[in-house]
Amino acid sequence: MNALPKTLLLGLCIALAACQSTQPDTLAKSARLNISEPLLAGLEYAQLLNGDAPWAGADRVQVDDQGLLLLDAAGNSLARHAGRFEGLDHRVDDKGLLLATVERKRQQAMLIGLNAARAWSQPLYLPRTAFAIEGLCLYRDSARNDFLFLLGEEGVGEQWLVGSQGRLLGEARRVRGLSLPPQSAFCQTDDRAGQLYVNEENVGFWRYPADAEAPLQREPVDLRQPFGSLAHAAAGMTMVPGGLLALDSEASVLHLYRQNEAGWQADEVIALDGFDEPERISARRSAEGVELLLADERGLQSARLDWQPPALSQPEPIVSLPAAVETGPVPSLGDAADDPAIWVHPRDPAQSRVLGTDKKGGLVVYDLDGRQVQDLRVGRLNNVDVRNGFRLGSKRVDLAVASNRDHNSLHLFAIDRASGVLSDVGEVATPLSEIYGLCMFQDRQGTTYAIANDKDGTFLQYRLDGRSGQPRGELVRRFKLGSQPE
C-alpha cells in the first residue's frame, strides 16, 4: 500500500478537524439582511456597545478625524478624546468604558477609560512594538483582569496585561509573545469561554485559548475551500451569544456559525451585495435579531440581520483570586518554581514565611512581602509541606519536609519557632525510584507523618521521630494507585 504524501495527509487532517458539520454549498435565503441608509463615508473603525453602559442613549464607539467618539444612535457625540487613531476594541459595563486603539503619530497601542461621569482617564501607552500593529483586541478574564492582544502581519503577536478590576494599570505588563499565522490582522475574544479567534487571510479562522498560561494550541473554525466553506479571504469577525459572524472580504459574503457542544457549526452564508471588500464587522444581539456595523472600502454601513442563534448554557467560570504579593523569580532558570507552603509564626503572624521549591535546585524562603530571606541549595525538591510542634532532641521545632528527586528521599528542615530560620536536619531514604509528590499529616497524639509518592503510583507513609536529635523515618504504610499522582 502506497503512503499518502505528507502535504495531502496534513490537508486531510485539517479538513477533518474543521468539518464539524455540513458546510453550506449555496448562499442561504433564510436569514435576511436589511441595509440601513445612509453610508457613513470614509469611516473604518466603529463598534456597537455590548453591555450595560451607564449613559442613556449610548449606542456605539467610533474612530474618525475628530478622535475617539462615544455616540448615540443618531450619531450625536456624548464624549470625545481628540487625536488620530486606528484600530478599535472596547469593553463596557455599568461603571464605564475601556477603549483600545493605536495612536497613529506614536505608532503605539493606547488604552483609555471613560467613567460614568464622562471623564476620560489618563491614556496608558504600551511600549512601541518591534512590528507594525495590524490588529488588536481586548480580553477580560473571570478575575476581571484586562488583557490586550496585538497582531503583526508577519505572524508575530503579544499579550499584555493592561488593567484589573475596571482600572488601567500604571504600567502595562507584557505577558507573553505569540507565534501566530502570517497574514493575521483581525482578532476577537470570547471572555466567558476564554477563547481567542484570529484570521489567517489565505487559510481561514483559528481558535486559541486566551488565558495567558494556556498552551498556544489552535483549532480551525473554518478554512478555505476545499477544506472548508470559505471561498477567498478570511477577514474580520465578531461574536454574539451563540453565534460567530465572519467576513470573506474578497467574496463579499458574511459567514454565520452556530455554537454547539462540539464547537462551531457552519450555518449560513449571506451575500453582501453592493459592498466593496468588507473587512470589519461589529454585532449586537437584539430582540429582532442582530444589529450590525459593516466597514468596506467606501465606509461604514449599518444593517440588521434576521438571525437568532440559540445561546448555549455556559458553565460558571472558575473564580480567580488576584495575587496580593509576588516574589522574584527563583534562582534556577526556566520552569523551576513549583510548590509552596506557608509557615505561620506562632506569636507574630507578620513574621510568617512562604516556602517554595525550586525544583531544579532547592528550597527558597520568602517573607510576606515576597522578599527572599533564605536559599537552601540542597537538590531538586519537588513538593514541600509543613507541620508544627516536632520534637528534635531536647527542643521543639516546626518541621518542613520536601521530596528530594536527586536522592529519592524525604528532606527535612527544622524551623526555629522564634526567628523563622530554616536549617537542614537531614534526609530519610526511601526505596522509590522516582519520588514526586509529598504531603504531611499529624494525628491527635501529635505524631508527625510524611506521605510521598512515586511517578508509578506508589505511596509510602513514614512516621517521623526526632527525639534522638537525628530525625528518623519508619515506614508504616504502603499503597498504590493505577496512574501517576501529583
Q: What kind of feature is each model-predicted range?
A:
Residues 1-8:
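Bacterial N-terminal signal peptides that target proteins for export
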